[in-house]
Amino acid sequence: MKENELKNEKSVDVLSFKQLESQKIVLPQDLFRSSFTWFCYEIYKSLAFRIWMLLWLPLSVWWKLSNNCIYPLIVSLLVLFLGPIFVLVICGLSRKRSLSKQLIQFCKEVTENTPSSDPHDWEVVAANLNSYLYENKAWNTKYFFFNAMVCQEAFRTTLLEPFSLKKDEAAKVKSFKDSVPYIEEALGVYFREVEKQWKLFNSEKSWSPVGLEDAKLPKEAYRFKLTWFLKRISNIFMLIPFLNFLCCIYVSRGMCLLLRTFYLGWILFMLVQGFQNMRMIVLSVKMEHKMQFLSTIINEQESGANGWDEIAKKMNRYLFEKKVWKNEEFFFDGIDCEWFFSHFFYRVLSAKKSMRALSLNVELWPYIKEAQLSCSEESLA
């Protein structure tokens, strides 16, 4: 009994130590008021910003010695307005260059800490890399990654997607050189953790809607899809583009009917595209939302249009309960749901080319294929 009590005490001590250790992780998001203040601090500490500030010394001397103030004024205005743009561009390029030189260390951190697609798993990786880059003088501050999500996105854009898109070994070696074996090991660890999360998600974390029989799709509440769409784009997310569209209607009142119709049609088309992309961005905030979408497609028993209607109802309820969307109107109907899957998941997988501001979903490729296969089998049945 005493031995068991000692073991229990030790296990409690280990757990409490791990909890304390996790609490000690400090990232810039814990030190700065917002990402904007962190960004301003990083710019202030950059070499490009200091060079831009030093440029004002010779300009001030020129102003004092010059008899003609026109040329100093022109140069000063150029430095004033174009200088910040160059500072931002140079700082962005410096970040990419610094990180590209530390790919091996990045991979070692991923291999050692085994993060999954959950952003919280990347906190240790982000904290360790922040310290490593500063201590090895690869970066001039201790705050390279603002938070875990920024670190995870850097892993995706720097390693995961570029490496996965390389077609053969020669192309990988040409682009990543000596880092190839480390990247392969890190990606292997990451994919295994994502697979564990997928299996856990489908078994223990499986979500089942309650009272779905009474749920209605937006197509049953709105007479036309355009009415539903106009209501959606008039919300807070699309308020500025919507007001811009109203402004375009006012500005175009002097045009001929044909030109005005074409112009306003093009503006409305751009609004539709922005709304569709916004939905995918909202869904991509957490990987578990995309996993739920794919899992719902795979596990749907009904086939054809009725099956997609059921998927749309379930996802509308899920996204509303998870507070991803403010109501149960994310998908208009089954056709809209099927288009969403085809456009943002299967099409990207087939082309293996990322869309603007959207992820390639490399870690979800096997499950996207499985979802597409289940759709094909249902249509054949």
Curated annotation (Swiss-Prot):
<feature type="topological domain" description="Cytoplasmic">
    <location>
        <begin position="276"/>
        <end position="381"/>
    </location>
</feature>
<feature type="transmembrane region" description="Helical">
    <location>
        <begin position="73"/>
        <end position="93"/>
    </location>
</feature>
<dbReference type="InterPro" id="IPR001142">
    <property type="entry name" value="DUP/COS"/>
</dbReference>
<feature type="transmembrane region" description="Helical">
    <location>
        <begin position="232"/>
        <end position="252"/>
    </location>
</feature>
<feature type="topological domain" description="Extracellular">
    <location>
        <begin position="253"/>
        <end position="254"/>
    </location>
</feature>
<keyword id="KW-0472">Membrane</keyword>
<feature type="topological domain" description="Cytoplasmic">
    <location>
        <begin position="1"/>
        <end position="42"/>
    </location>
</feature>
<dbReference type="GO" id="GO:0043328">
    <property type="term" value="P:protein transport to vacuole involved in ubiquitin-dependent protein catabolic process via the multivesicular body sorting pathway"/>
</dbReference>
<dbReference type="GO" id="GO:0000324">
    <property type="term" value="C:fungal-type vacuole"/>
</dbReference>
<feature type="topological domain" description="Extracellular">
    <location>
        <begin position="64"/>
        <end position="72"/>
    </location>
</feature>
<dbReference type="GO" id="GO:0000329">
    <property type="term" value="C:fungal-type vacuole membrane"/>
</dbReference>
<keyword id="KW-1133">Transmembrane helix</keyword>
<dbReference type="Pfam" id="PF00674">
    <property type="entry name" value="DUP"/>
</dbReference>
<feature type="topological domain" description="Cytoplasmic">
    <location>
        <begin position="94"/>
        <end position="231"/>
    </location>
</feature>
<feature type="transmembrane region" description="Helical">
    <location>
        <begin position="43"/>
        <end position="63"/>
    </location>
</feature>
<feature type="transmembrane region" description="Helical">
    <location>
        <begin position="255"/>
        <end position="275"/>
    </location>
</feature>
<protein>
    <recommendedName>
        <fullName>Protein COS1</fullName>
    </recommendedName>
</protein>
<dbReference type="GO" id="GO:0005768">
    <property type="term" value="C:endosome"/>
</dbReference>
<keyword id="KW-0812">Transmembrane</keyword>
<comment type="similarity">
    <text>Belongs to the DUP/COS family.</text>
</comment>
